[in-house]
Every structure is written in structure tokens, then in C-alpha cells.
Amino acid sequence: MIKLPVLLADINIQSLPTEPELILNNLAITTLVENLIILLLVATLVALVARWLKIPYVIGLVLAGLAIPRGLSVGLNPELILNFFLPILIFEAAINTDISRLRSTIKPITVLAGPGVVISAAITAVLLKIGLGLAWVTAAGVSVILTITDTVSVIAAFRSVPVPRRLATIVEGESMLNDGVAMVLLSVITTIHIQGGFSAGEGIRQIFVAFVGGGLVGLGLGYLCVGLFRQLNDDLSDILLTVSVSLGTFQIGQMLGVSSAIAVVVAGLVIGNLALKQTSASIKVTLLSFWEYAGFGVNTLIFLLVGIEVYPSILLSTIPAALIAIVAYQIGRVFSIYPLLYLLSFFDRPLPLRWQHVLIAGNVKGSLSMALALALPLTLPGRDQVVTLVFSTVMVSLIGQGLSLPWVVKKLQLSKPSPLAQKIAMLQLNLVTAKAAQGELKYLLEAGSLPKFLYEELFADYQARIANSEQELREFYNQRNLIFSEGEVEKKYIDGLYRRLYIAEKSAINDALAKGILADDISDEYLQVLNEKLLALQDD
């Protein structure tokens, strides 16, 4: 049995704020602003490097954070994490979830996010108790925290390698719901720690009240928000309203003693599927863009700051414990995926075995796990060790599992492109390469490095390739109904082209408005049409 080393003397716990006297109170406001500016610039640079290296953005943030001097830290306040960051992450996932897509996958999602989380957490807790010698209540808390899946990393892998839409929906839906389930279980474990235990009946009652009460609070506030949406009909006011609802729902849930996470999830689903459908297309685009940015910003700060807060030497010393934790929660995941989905196949459409492999390989940990670790009560035995263990486990998971996930998904060949998709891709490749070659020919001609007769001959050859490719693509476009019936890959190709064109049109209109070239009334009408077309592409 490997004992988790006592890190209290090694890691500067002041860097993981556990007292009211936080780093934020010790830094001058000007220094804090300067640090934030530097961190934002670092995050921007990381995004560019991650795109160039073709690695997930969040992994780049963590690695960059490890290299950043600790003097740039702005502190990680547990109260800020719990009451501000968590509601934003949960609400952003919920407001972007289409209930109509969830209906067809509700059974596997419910099984995985309900009994699946309980089984996985129980097995993980036993293995952590045996492998790391943690106290039972501590092992239970860590196991629940590590049942949460990082949707950001998984969806990033799905974008690089196309997967069936139903699988993506299951992953997103399970991740959204198991956040709430994990927080309820963590609340029960915390209560057991504080009270010294209670009966099984009392535990079931608490869980029931947390789920049902949270759902009712979310429904009530969500429907109230729907009514206010009808009255406001203004994008900026609607943004303020949704921010108030997301943060306020979380606080009300805590005050009433119900699941704040479930309340925020339900409120987000109601607003995203009822309120937004009653607003104009431009308001909907603005709102969804705002929440996409909010979620992106929170994830950026959490991953970057966590990388700063953990000493590389401490991370290296806790890698053995982190590897044990990863093995433990992966074993728990195996026993919650294969048996449950096998039993479910008798009552619902079976999930292919390759999909189940992805659900296990995609069991990557992320920002929510770290946020919950920071929000643990200060009196929990070994809390400082737990925080360090969770941080190290998340980092190893992101780097190891996060980098390997796209390769695993590609090897499983979940969505083979049809011959038609391959043909379209080849024609597009011909267009790109031929036009690039023509551009180089023009440059050589103007520089005097190429005779004109040779330029004309070579240019004509490439022009013939372009003409042939464009003719074949035009024929595919004229048969677009056939293309759509071939599968989602081809439709995504056409939709992607339209989306880029519509965005280019919007950009041109906004530039013209800024220069006073176009009238506001006519431009607003056309922008509304473009927004509706963009939303139609998203809804397909």
C-alpha cells in the first residue's frame, strides 16, 4: 500500500487559500490587474501554440501554468470557485443543451449519470482506501470528485475526429447530469463527516430532497425567467437576466438546502429550450455567444491558475498517487459502463461496444473536479492532501488521457467517411493546392523569375484542375439532397461553408455600419435574416 505523503509542509497552503485572509487581500489592486493582463496574454499565446501543435487548449494552459512564476498568481478562493465559477460552468452547459436531442438518449444518460456514478464512486473509494490508505470519508469524497468528466476535453477530441451525433449527445448529457449527482453525493458525505454519520433512511431522504427540491427550484426560476424574457426583448438585458438567474439559482438552492447544481441545470434547460425559442434570432445568437465566452473564460482561468498554484516538484512527487487514483477511477468506470449498458440493451437501443470504449477512454478529469476539491470543508481530514491529490490527478489525466483520446477515437473508427465524403474532400484539396500554386506563379512572374510563356502554360494547367474540381463540386451541390442522405459528414461540410459565408456577410455589414455607409434599419433587417440562417444551421 502506498501512503499519500503529507504535503502540508511542502506545499504552500497559502497558495491554495484555506483562510479568510486570501491572496486577493494581500495584493494591491494595480498588481492584481497587471497579473490578470499578463495571464490573459499568456492564455492567448497558449491558444496559438496549442492550435499549432494540435493539442487540447486546456492541456496547454496547465503546462503553461506550471512554467509561470508563482508571483503572478491571483489566488484561488474556494468561495469564489463554489459560488461563481461552478454555476457559470453548469449553466453554460445546460443552456446549450437541446432537450429534443436528449429525449432519444435519456435512458443511457440517466443510467450513467445515476447508478453509474454511485457504482463508480463506490468502487473508486474502496480502491483509494486500499491503495493510498485514506480515511473512509476522505476516500469517498475524492472518489465522488473524480467521477466528474471534463466535457471540454472530450468534445475537443470529437471535433478533431468526427463521431456519431448520438454518442456526442450521450457524452454531453451524462457530463451535465453527473455534475449535479456528484455534488449531491459530496454534500451527503460532508454531512456524514460533520454529524458523524446517519441512518440509510436519512441519507436516502436527503438525496431525494436534494434532487426533487433542486429540480423544483430550477423549474420555478426558469419559468419565471421565461416570462421576463417576453417583457424585456433586449439582448443586453437578457444577458444580465441569465447571469442573475444562474448565480441566483445556485444561492437559493443552497439557502433552501437542496441541490444547487440540479437547480442550475434545470433552470438552464428551461431557459435554453423555452425562453430562447421565444426571442429573436439576434438575441439568441448574442446570448449563446456570451455564455460560450463565459464558459471559455472560466475554464481558462481555472486551468491556468491551478497550473500556477502547484509546484512542479510537488506534482512530480504525487504522480505515483495520481496514477493510483486514475487506475482506481478507471476501474470504477469500467464496472459502471459495461454491465449497466449491457442490462440497458434489453430495454433500449444497444450502444455499440466501440462507443462504450470511448466512454471509458474519455473519462478525463477537468475544471469541475478541481473546483469541488477547493470547495471542500476546511475541517475535512487531510483536506490539503485531497486538494493536492485531485490537482495532480487532473493534471496527469489531462496530459495523458487528454492527449491520447483523439488517437483512441480515430483508431476505433467510429465514423468512417463515406466514399462521397472522401471525393468531396479530395476536390476541395485540389482547389486549395491549385490556387496556392497559381498564387506562387504570379509572384514568380512579377519578380522576373519566370518567363511569361512558361507562366501561361503552367497557369493554364492549374486553371484546368480548378475548373474540373469546381464543376464536380457544383454537381454535388445540385444533388445536395442526395449528399445529405449519405450521412452527417457531407452535411457538415456544406453547413460549414454556409456558416463561413454568413459570418463573412455579417462582418461586412458591421464594418459598413461602423463607417456609416449603410442605413441602420435596412442593415438590421438583413442581419436578422443572417442570424436566423445561422441558427437554422445550428439546429439541424
Swiss-Prot record:
Disruption phenotype: Mutant cannot grow at low sodium concentrations and exhibits an increased sensitivity towards potassium. This is Na(+)/H(+) antiporter NhaS2. It comes from Synechocystis sp. (strain ATCC 27184 / PCC 6803 / Kazusa). GO terms for biological process: potassium ion transmembrane transport; regulation of intracellular pH; sodium ion import across plasma membrane. Required for Na(+) uptake into the cell, especially at low external Na(+) concentrations or low Na(+)/K(+) ratios. May be part of a sodium cycle that permits re-entry of sodium into the cell. Belongs to the monovalent cation:proton antiporter 1 (CPA1) transporter (TC 2.A.36) family. GO terms for molecular function: potassium:proton antiporter activity; sodium:proton antiporter activity. Gene3D superfamilies: 1.20.1530.20. It is found in: Cell membrane. The keyword Oxidoreductase does not apply. The chain crosses the membrane at residues 29-49, 71-91, 117-137, 138-158, 207-227, 256-276, 296-316, 323-343, 358-378, 389-409. The gene is nhaS2. It is a multi-pass membrane protein. One of its GO terms (cellular component) is plasma membrane.
